């Protein structure tokens, strides 16, 4: 009898959710109604609330009462509450779920994250909301095309502004290191990207000095021959076919939106290597620490992002023993940044950085003064 009464209260809770009755939901929960029951369609009360924009207050109430923010519904139109809200373009509900610790990297039965669902449905506002929550980098950059010689003398004619983000991908196994992908949109208003490059299969070619060349080349090697037999056969192809094979690779050349913006280029390069910026880490790292709700899917943590950096090539650092400027890699390192105290480069390079207010090339701290050092 008690079980039948409990089930009846659970059914009444679904009715109150549909009726947008916040007080009725609180009353039933106080009387013992469960928050994780499922209806005939396999939906929890929170999933049901995340299918209608008018039920935002209901979703907020259920989360405050302790509903599982990552409850999973199986099926072709299933997933977590975040999947359901993203599929319907409910941007306010999406932000609410993310603020309560929703895991944006969970895959549904169609092997899609909520971000990919929002892209497919064309909801650019939802795409931006999720990307801003999980990205290691986002910003407007310049995409180069054409020959290097023309890029040198007329870059404005051969470059166009694009919106670029670096985000982690979804995985069935949350214990494995996260993988990153570079996503390129023609504009910030677009929901569907023009290009997606898996960074774990790509090569990042950086110039020795951003002072001489302010661009970065990303080469996608995912289409390269993988098997040993393919590698052996590739050694016998003609030179013409070899060039054709190279042309099929995705080669993306990007530069900062504002020419000479070393801070943006360093941020982008570090993000591609899986290194978050200490002053601006992805917001999902913060929410995962603040979330105490018990969930079926593990929330993201600092350890997860640490595994990203460990699974990617470590950033190249200047050899401190060679005594060369880390910027031009030519002149001796003879000047110190004040107040941070880093001996980071030659006097001319550091003076230029100081004038442009770019910050110390080592720690990004503001430079109040550059002092030349003399060896006695």
From Swiss-Prot:
Reaction(s) catalysed by this chain, per the record, are: S-ubiquitinyl-[E2 ubiquitin-conjugating enzyme]-L-cysteine + [acceptor protein]-L-lysine = [E2 ubiquitin-conjugating enzyme]-L-cysteine + N(6)-ubiquitinyl-[acceptor protein]-L-lysine
ANK repeat positions in this chain?
41-71, 77-106
Domain of life according to the entry: Eukaryota
Q: Which CDD domains does the annotation name?
A: RING-HC_XBAT35-like
| Name of a matching Pfam family | zf-C3HC4_3
A molecular-function term among this protein's GO annotations: transferase activity
Gene3D superfamilies (alphabetical): Ankyrin repeat-containing domain, Zinc/RING finger domain, C3HC4 (zinc finger)
Q: Where exactly are the zinc fingers annotated as RING-type?
A: 325-364
Q: Name one GO biological process term.
A: protein ubiquitination
The kind of enzyme this is, by top-level EC class, is transferase
Q: Which UniProt keywords apply?
A: ANK repeat, Metal-binding, Repeat, Transferase, Ubl conjugation pathway, Zinc, Zinc-finger
EC code(s) of this entry: 2.3.2.27
- PROSITE patterns cross-referenced by the UniProt entry: ANK_REP_REGION, ANK_REPEAT, ZF_RING_2
User: What InterPro entries does this protein map onto?
Assistant: Ankyrin_rpt, Ankyrin_rpt-contain_sf, Znf_RING, Znf_RING/FYVE/PHD
Pathway, per Swiss-Prot/TrEMBL?
Answer: Protein modification; protein ubiquitination
**Functional note:** No E3 ubiquitin-protein ligase activity observed when associated with the E2 enzyme UBC8 in vitro.
Protein name in the entry: Putative E3 ubiquitin-protein ligase XBAT34
Question: Which species expresses this protein natively?
Answer: Arabidopsis thaliana (Mouse-ear cress)
